[in-house]
A protein has these predicted regions:
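Compositionally biased, low-complexity/repeat regions
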Residues: 88, 99-102, 171-190, 426-482
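A glycine- and small-residue-enriched flexible loop/hinge signal that marks low-structured segments
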Residues: 2-21, 27-45, 49-52, 68-96, ...
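Generic recognition of long tandem-repeat/solenoid scaffolds
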Residues: 114-119, 149-159, 348-351, 355-366, ...
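Surface-exposed interaction regions enriched in Ser/Thr/Asp/Glu
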Residues: 127-185
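Acidic, low-complexity glycine/serine/threonine-rich segments
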Residues: 376-436
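Extended beta-strand solenoid/passenger and fiber regions
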Residues: 84-146, 175-177
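Short, ordered beta-strand-loop transition motifs
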Residues: 107-112, 140-153, 252-254, 270, ...
Length: 482
């Protein structure tokens, strides 16, 4: 053993653990996309894909302005073009091997060695081209690309068999978004193959990307009660431990007036505390979106602009739209009084108040549930986010010795973390270890329980100023103050 004489130091690992910061408003969006335009159409189905830019999303799943048939494109446009927020996670369920249809034979004219087949959704690998009854070979006699409208463009090669052709005969197969059903969105598990589809892929997000879902969306689908209720159910117990929120739409083909919305909500069972329920649809110029696509992007943008902490309500924020409408395009005009009626029924809407703004703070559980942590959308999200962050931060402590040092480390770290968010992000946050909540029998079974108290700010939804006439002021003014 060494003989020590002098002054020495020794470093020890810090007992306060730095928190792991996730993406608070990470959107997981399920729907359909024009995968025939993707870089690899046959590897874009039922696979979660993360996108940090519009071009990256287009490369992975394709893009079209046909939002009714290709619902993922609503969120792609809303996130990257309307509000500019990233990343997002896309889950396309349109399967080009399953959801497809044979097209009628097309005869197209050739101009300057090119011919455009004006049929949407063509799968390039299914194309058969003939010129003067001669079958042409792809890659040798011609190449295929897609134009900005999604139409197939056939370019003849100078030395190919069809170089002199004036017309081409084209047979092809297209993807068929109308063949996608609610069951495809909800998804399931194939016991024989082990394959998971649709919403079942939500559990893949953390293992694949090391990020926890913040918001679940399926614009264009959640107005269908089977889909909406299933998506709300997926907000809890993700990977057995994580929690998030979802954004749902009311069917504007059925609820055509604001007075129809409450009955529709209750009849369809949209009362989950983890759900924000929206009405009606929105427009940006000529484009028509499910409101959930825009509101999801707005919520994520609000978080990102606030140090990635979801304590702010996305209500009364500019949303970049140009109007409200129903499914058939009929304009909807709401004033604040009508919008407030919807808010009181647990429905979020939008109003034009010197610019179009989101309007509403209550989750779908209101007014049946008035617990502040559940009824206020920002408070509900704050609790989910804090819980997820706690799990991610202290997972490294699992299987360490269950001694006082571990307990002290968690309590000290969490209280320091909580104090760092006061007063800007919350009114208070503290954690305790109580012997009353940790009987010896639990300790012997390896179970340790903490008790944390959180106080996120509730939104200042109703600000009242009482105005009263003061005759003494008038008297003083007229008498010269004497």
């Amino acid at each position: 053993m060494a003989y020590n004489h002098g002054v020495r130091v020794k470093e020890q690992a810090t007992s306060l653990v730095a928190p792991v910061t996730g993406t608070a408003g990470l959107q997981v969006i399920i729907g359909t996309a024009p995968v025939n335009l993707a870089a690899d159409p046959y590897k874009a189905t039922n696979v979660p894909m993360t996108a940090y830019s519009f071009s990256e999303a287009v490369e992975q799943v394709g893009y079209s302005d046909d939002f009714k048939n290709y619902t993922l494109c609503q969120s792609m446009d809303a996130c990257f073009r309307v509000l500019n927020i990233a990343p997002i996670i896309l889950i396309n369920v349109l399967d080009p091997k399953k959801h497809k249809k044979a097209n009628e034979e097309q005869t197209v004219n050739v101009e300057k060695m090119q011919a455009t087949v004006k049929v949407v959704g063509i799968l390039a690998d299914t194309v058969e081209v003939k010129a003067n009854e001669a079958t042409l070979t792809a890659g040798t006699d011609y190449i295929t690309t897609f134009d900005d409208d999604g139409y197939l463009v056939i370019t003849l090669t100078a030395g190919g068999k069809g170089a002199s052709a004036k017309t081409l005969t084209v047979n092809s197969t297209s993807i068929d978004p109308t063949a996608v059903t609610e069951s495809d969105i909800i998804g399931g598990y194939d016991a024989s193959t082990g394959a998971e589809t649709g919403m079942e892929l939500i559990r893949h997000i953390y293992p694949k990307f090391s990020m926890t879902p913040g918001l679940l969306l399926a614009p264009g689908w959640t107005q269908k009660s089977n889909v909406g209720i299933a998506l709300a159910a997926k907000c809890e117990e993700i990977n057995g431990v994580f929690t998030c929120e979802c954004i749902l739409d009311i069917d504007t083909a059925e609820a055509t007036k604001y007075t129809d919305c409450n009955d529709w909500k209750n009849e369809n069972g949209y009362t989950n505390k983890h759900a924000a329920l929206l009405w009606p649809q929105v427009k940006v110029g000529t484009k028509q979106y499910a409101y959930s696509a825009i509101f999801g992007a707005l919520t994520a943008y609000t978080d990102a602009s606030n140090d990635d902490v979801p304590n702010l309500s996305p209500s009364n924020k500019l949303i970049g739209i140009t109007g409200l409408c129903l499914e058939d395009g009929t304009e909807v005009v709401l004033d604040e009084l009508q919008a407030n009626l919807l808010n009181g029924q647990g429905i979020i809407t939008a109003i034009n108040d010197s610019g179009w703004k989101s309007w509403g703070n209550n989750t779908a559980c209101y007014p049946a549930n008035t617990d502040p942590k559940d009824r206020w959308f920002c408070c509900r999200r704050f609790f989910s986010w804090w819980g997820n962050s706690f799990i991610l931060t202290y997972k490294q402590k699992v299987d360490d010795n269950g001694n006082y040092r571990l307990i002290e480390s968690v309590v000290d770290s969490e209280n320091i973390r909580g104090n760092s968010y006061v007063p800007s992000k919350c009114a208070g946050a503290r954690i305790e270890f109580s012997e009353d909540e940790n009987p010896v029998t639990d300790i012997l079974n390896g179970k340790i329980q903490f008790h944390q108290y959180l106080a996120p700010y509730v939104p200042a939804e109703d600000i009242l100023n009482i105005l009263e006439f003061d005759p003494t002021m008038l008297s003083a003014a007229l008498s010269g103050g004497e």
